[in-house]
């Protein structure tokens, strides 16, 4: 299935690229999320008419993400207070939702999907470096402190 990308998609292409993807990926993910349209003659003509508008919207999203990344960089640390047991082990764990809620409580809106924890949830008291991916091209590392209650 050939599609035209309406926004930048990681490891696939940028706005306006005509790419070949598996039918299921195009039908079930790219098209419903508004990231692409099927590459038919009429859609290609419609896209060319809207190209400048779509590129401007993509640029605006990136600029907004860079602004949020700057706010995250200005804030030195984010702290989460959690209940702990013996030897600094947490009761439960700290996951992406907890981190996103802590950052949002400090005034910077972040969704849980933007928080990247490649090693999985955090289960001990301490300092951690966590990546926040605000846009395909914009990632900001933050310092997260998990303290005992």
From Swiss-Prot:
<dbReference type="GO" id="GO:0005840">
    <property type="term" value="C:ribosome"/>
</dbReference>
<dbReference type="InterPro" id="IPR000244">
    <property type="entry name" value="Ribosomal_bL9"/>
</dbReference>
<keyword id="KW-0687">Ribonucleoprotein</keyword>
<dbReference type="GO" id="GO:0003735">
    <property type="term" value="F:structural constituent of ribosome"/>
</dbReference>
<keyword id="KW-0689">Ribosomal protein</keyword>
<comment type="function">
    <text>Binds to the 23S rRNA.</text>
</comment>
<dbReference type="GO" id="GO:1990904">
    <property type="term" value="C:ribonucleoprotein complex"/>
</dbReference>
<dbReference type="GO" id="GO:0006412">
    <property type="term" value="P:translation"/>
</dbReference>
<comment type="similarity">
    <text>Belongs to the bacterial ribosomal protein bL9 family.</text>
</comment>
<dbReference type="Pfam" id="PF01281">
    <property type="entry name" value="Ribosomal_L9_N"/>
</dbReference>
<dbReference type="InterPro" id="IPR009027">
    <property type="entry name" value="Ribosomal_bL9/RNase_H1_N"/>
</dbReference>
<dbReference type="InterPro" id="IPR036791">
    <property type="entry name" value="Ribosomal_bL9_C_sf"/>
</dbReference>
<dbReference type="GO" id="GO:0019843">
    <property type="term" value="F:rRNA binding"/>
</dbReference>
<dbReference type="Pfam" id="PF03948">
    <property type="entry name" value="Ribosomal_L9_C"/>
</dbReference>
<protein>
    <recommendedName>
        <fullName>Large ribosomal subunit protein bL9</fullName>
    </recommendedName>
</protein>
<dbReference type="InterPro" id="IPR020069">
    <property type="entry name" value="Ribosomal_bL9_C"/>
</dbReference>
<dbReference type="InterPro" id="IPR020070">
    <property type="entry name" value="Ribosomal_bL9_N"/>
</dbReference>
<keyword id="KW-0699">rRNA-binding</keyword>
<keyword id="KW-0694">RNA-binding</keyword>
<dbReference type="InterPro" id="IPR036935">
    <property type="entry name" value="Ribosomal_bL9_N_sf"/>
</dbReference>
<dbReference type="InterPro" id="IPR020594">
    <property type="entry name" value="Ribosomal_bL9_bac/chp"/>
</dbReference>
């Amino acid at each position: 299935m050939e599609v035209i990308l309406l926004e930048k998609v990681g490891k696939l292409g940028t706005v306006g690229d005509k790419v070949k993807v598996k039918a299921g990926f195009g039908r079930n993910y790219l098209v419903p999320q508004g990231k692409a349209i099927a590459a038919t003659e009429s859609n290609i003509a419609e896209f060319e008419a809207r190209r400048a508008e779509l590129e401007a919207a993509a640029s605006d999203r990136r600029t907004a993400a860079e602004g949020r990344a700057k706010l995250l960089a200005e804030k030195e640390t984010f702290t989460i207070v959690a209940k702990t047991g013996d030897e600094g082990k947490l009761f439960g764990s700290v996951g992406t939702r907890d981190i996103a809620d802590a950052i949002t409580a400090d005034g910077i809106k972040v969704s849980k999907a933007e928080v990247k924890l490649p090693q999985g949830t955090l289960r001990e008291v301490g300092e951690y470096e966590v990546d926040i991916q605000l846009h395909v091209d914009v990632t900001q590392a933050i310092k997260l402190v998990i303290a005992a209650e």
